[in-house]
């Protein structure tokens, strides 16, 4: 059983804070099981977006973990990411959007193995 989305987001933001990275909830989704998208602003007009990994990426040995995949391998213009997030919200109104700011692009997420 996975952590509720609101608890995971609170813990993730606390982790960012302890690493000296600013983070905030841009959009609250469903507290129980809303998908979480993480935008990492590089503070230069570019950003990275991390989306929930497909269910097939989950490890049976670690069922409580959340895994993410980068939407693109390279940073994208922030307006492109905002357009993508708007589409995600139209598709899934229960989704969460969390944004962090870090010039180095640190995200502190568990990435799915590809």
What is each residue range found by the language model?
Residues 13-14, 25-28, 85-89:
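A generic local secondary-structure boundary/capping motif
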Residues 19, 32-34, 91-94:
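Short, basic and Ser/Thr-rich N-terminal targeting/leader segments
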Residues 1-20, 28, 53-57, 103-105, ...:
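Long, contiguous binding/interaction regions
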């Amino acid at each position: 059983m996975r952590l509720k989305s609101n608890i995971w987001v609170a813990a993730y933001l606390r982790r960012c804070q302890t690493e000296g990275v600013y983070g905030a909830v841009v959009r609250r989704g469903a507290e129980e099981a809303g998908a979480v998208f993480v935008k990492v602003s590089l503070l230069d007009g570019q950003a990275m977006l991390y989306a929930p990994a497909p269910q097939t990426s989950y490890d049976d040995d670690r069922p409580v973990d959340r895994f993410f995949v980068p939407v693109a391998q390279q940073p994208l213009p922030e307006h492109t990411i905002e357009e993508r997030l708007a589409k995600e919200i139209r598709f899934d109104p229960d989704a969460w959007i969390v944004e962090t700011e870090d010039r180095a692009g640190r995200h502190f997420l568990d990435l799915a193995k590809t």
